[in-house]
């Protein structure tokens, strides 16, 4: 795997509210860990996301607040950028779908599919609110989900079961602005012919035996139900304009154009670095692996609609993997910024360090099933794993060396069981992370931390310093190697604290290159120990 190109696309968050912890667990933290890991092993990564700023999620918020959609988008774009920055998540580019560059890319994509016969005109029945006097697409309509019975399902999707919906499927639908029952009227729109790609998508899915079972099952079930053409335009003012004469009042559906935002982002980054065709290396080179990190509710858009769009366009790479996570819950309920359930990221970062949040969320990622977030468990996990096991081991090792002012010299060879254990743990860790198994890789790291503490205790350097200086030097060198492995391996998860500890180990190499020397015998020039961890007290966390 080493030395290949990797494209990592992260779901574009809607710019209609603050980021909550469920968002981070759903897509962004796993992607960031994966990107950092791939760069550590020498892969070339393009890391793309952006701000999803069109469509009804934005206009609904704007109308409720008496603001313009652009004002809402501007506010939350800036807020999201700052939240990601505080959390240590740094995309190569974070584009905005309201950029003119994106409109151009989306319109070109639309026209290409239209010319290829993949998009066609047709009519559909859409909700119309007589009281307000206009069509009310998608999130302007709420009602009961016909599949799971959730009472607050939206006209485009059910937040509870993840099903994509049409407004007329809802039981007892109402307009969220007027409270009135909408009437359904005929309106002309453009449709994506998903049915044209059913067989090709089924064949493609047969090659995805390594996908998460939940993603594969969801996608197969969706296809087995029969793919139908899907409307990709809306009667709305806020969005990318349909680039055809006579249809200037129509807008391209947000979920169609937002997916194209991945390509927009790659193109814009290519312009920024002065290599306009760089993006093509990630979309046309068949050796490149494209990963899409998303939440459960976005699975059908990325595993069916987007691949169909790519097939329709022609020659563009299909997703290699879609490691979608399930939901993060709070006291058994799904995190929701619209319903005020759970914490926003900014709320938590006001009382705990970013690395603490990153570590805990990584340890409970809902990779194959829902996970529940608990502040009490966060405190216990951080105190136990990061501080009592990892931090304590490193501090004891460095403090002992500094206490006796020792200059630890490297041995000619390392024929030590502990070194072999660390090498094997590192290999397993890399194997798991290469497959986007975030929690498994973290569990391997934690087992190594437990082993390292045991090794230090059994070595008894406090006795060896008196009886056998050479053996004491050797045991402390092995302890430093264990600390080095642990620090490099935790770096993708807790980058700020890992970097601080790496510098205290006194390795003559930046931590971003750390993986290249782990299995070798290197020098250490130990600095004073200042472990960047403090225990959390649940009673002092005021939220």
Swiss-Prot record:
Binding positions (Zn(2+)): 145, 148, 158, 161
PROSITE patterns (alphabetical): AA_TRNA_LIGASE_I (PS00178)
Keywords assigned: Aminoacyl-tRNA synthetase, ATP-binding, Cytoplasm, Ligase, Metal-binding, Nucleotide-binding, Protein biosynthesis, Zinc
The keyword Protein biosynthesis is assigned to this record: yes
Catalysed transformations (reactions): tRNA(Met) + L-methionine + ATP = L-methionyl-tRNA(Met) + AMP + diphosphate
Disulfide bonds: none
GO biological process: methionyl-tRNA aminoacylation
Intervals of motif 'HIGH' region: 13-23
Gene3D superfamilies given in the database record: HUPs, Isoleucyl-tRNA Synthetase, Domain 1, Methionyl-tRNA synthetase, Zn-domain
CDD domains xref list: Anticodon_Ia_Met (cd07957), MetRS_core (cd00814)
Motif ('KMSKS' region): 334-338
Any one GO cellular component localisation term in the record: cytosol
Entry-linked InterPro entries: aa-tRNA-synth_I_CS, Anticodon_Met, Met-tRNA_ligase_1, Met-tRNA_synth, Methionyl/Leucyl_tRNA_Synth, MetRS_core, MetRS_Zn, Rossmann-like_a/b/a_fold
Subcellular location: Cytoplasm
A GO term for molecular function: ATP binding
Free-text function comment from the UniProt entry: Is required not only for elongation of protein synthesis but also for the initiation of all mRNA translation through initiator tRNA(fMet) aminoacylation.
Record-given protein name: Methionine--tRNA ligase
Provenance organism: Thermoplasma volcanium (strain ATCC 51530 / DSM 4299 / JCM 9571 / NBRC 15438 / GSS1)
Name of the coding gene: metG
